[in-house]
Amino acid sequence: METTSIRLTIRNLPDHFDRTRISAVLDEIELALLEERDIHCSTSADSFTITIVVPTLRLVDVATCLKAIGLI
């Protein structure tokens, strides 16, 4: 299965995400994708970015979900 990595800058997260609790943000992203679109993903973060690895064939669904929660 081919995957696509989506990278989001932490400093550009919307205000309703707590930038001081990145692990909670990652959990929220994973939960939204799983519950709303049945998409399993992998998330990680470093000091500057959040990385979301998703199946390439589900990229449109991922984008729709991320838009709904205010990330894109």
What are these language model-derived features?
Residues V53-D61:
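Helix N-cap motif at beta-to-alpha junctions
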